[in-house]
Amino acid sequence: MIDLRLPLTDIHRHLDGNIRAQSILELGRQYNIALPASDLDALRPHVQVTKNEPDLLSFLQKLDWGVAVLGSLDACRRVAYENVEDAMNAGLDYAELRFSPYYMAMNHKLPIAGVVEAVIDGITAGSRDFDTDIRLIGIMSRTFGTEACQQELDALLSQRDRIVALDLAGDELGYPGAQFTSHFQQARDAGWHITVHAGEAAGPESIWQAINHLGAERIGHGVTAIIDPRLMTHMAETGIGIESCLTSNIQTSTVETLDKHPLIHFLRYGIPATINTDDPAVQGIEIRHEYEVAAPLAGLTAVETRKAQENGLNIAFISEQEKQQLREKVLRKRASA
């Protein structure tokens, strides 16, 4: 269960994986983009997981219709704004929204730097209108290769003060982290935090690469860390967090069933592991489902669930002062409710 005395966070949440089905329908009509269906009920199976996918790449294809309708920078601005509203409606006090500007730009050849600016504008407007603290993480989509990732990184660096971290996502098996060492050096030189998708489709060696070569402070998913006790000890001792996404890992067939998910073992090992959504619109879930349905099915006790909730703020990419201010704000808000 969610502890209402603590800030509720989601620190692994893809902005471009949370584009509403209704918005896909409306933007498709606005930009004359042929969609696989013309009404919401018929469209939903094409843009939302209805059964577990055979692998990560099959799951990621569900995201493609969301970015296919981004026919202008205004469309990018709109979906960013709606992401903040969705975070508020989900009851989140703090969220780190991550996005790949190259992925969002590519269908309609939008300027990548313009996409970054549009997302920032949408987040700024949403943060003004909705009472949720939002930070942005830039993603490099490794699937498109190192050169495309450099273009993406350059666009993100042009707004370096509005981005808190860099991530690497996409085809983990085909594009290992070691190919991106120079990219992450640039990010660290800019003062950004580092999180990396690793140990989702590949083994623990991918997590070691993310830590040793890319400077990862947090690992997205990280499920295969469970087969390397030395890695788990290292993560526990150094405070490298795991951004667990329970339902997502089932839907991508990364983990067979929730009762086999390693999150409970990560927590008991002392790794600062957290509970997150991943791509809520595509998955058809929200953060409350992860706490109230998925976490108990994964074997977490109330104490362990609370620890994961605490970890969500403890390893967030904000200062200790900002964390304390958020804790105090939440207590005031709950007291006046």
UniProtKB/Swiss-Prot annotation:
SUPFAM superfamilies recorded: Metallo-dependent hydrolases (SSF51556)
Signal peptide: none
Entry-linked Pfam families: A_deaminase
Binding note for cofactor: Binds 1 zinc ion per subunit.
Any Gene Ontology CC annotation: cytosol
EC number annotated for this UniProt entry: 3.5.4.4
EC class: hydrolase
A GO MF term: adenosine deaminase activity
Gene Ontology biological-process entries: adenosine catabolic process; hypoxanthine salvage; inosine biosynthetic process; nucleotide metabolic process; purine ribonucleoside monophosphate biosynthetic process
Keywords, alphabetical: Hydrolase, Metal-binding, Nucleotide metabolism, Zinc
Residues that coordinate or bind substrate: H14, D16, G170, D279
Reported function: Catalyzes the hydrolytic deamination of adenosine and 2-deoxyadenosine.
NCBIfam families found in the cross-reference section: aden_deam (TIGR01430), PRK09358.1-1 (NF006846)
Family note: Belongs to the metallo-dependent hydrolases superfamily. Adenosine and AMP deaminases family. Adenosine deaminase subfamily.
Protein name, per record: Adenosine deaminase
UniProt organism field: Pectobacterium atrosepticum (strain SCRI 1043 / ATCC BAA-672)
The gene coding this protein: add
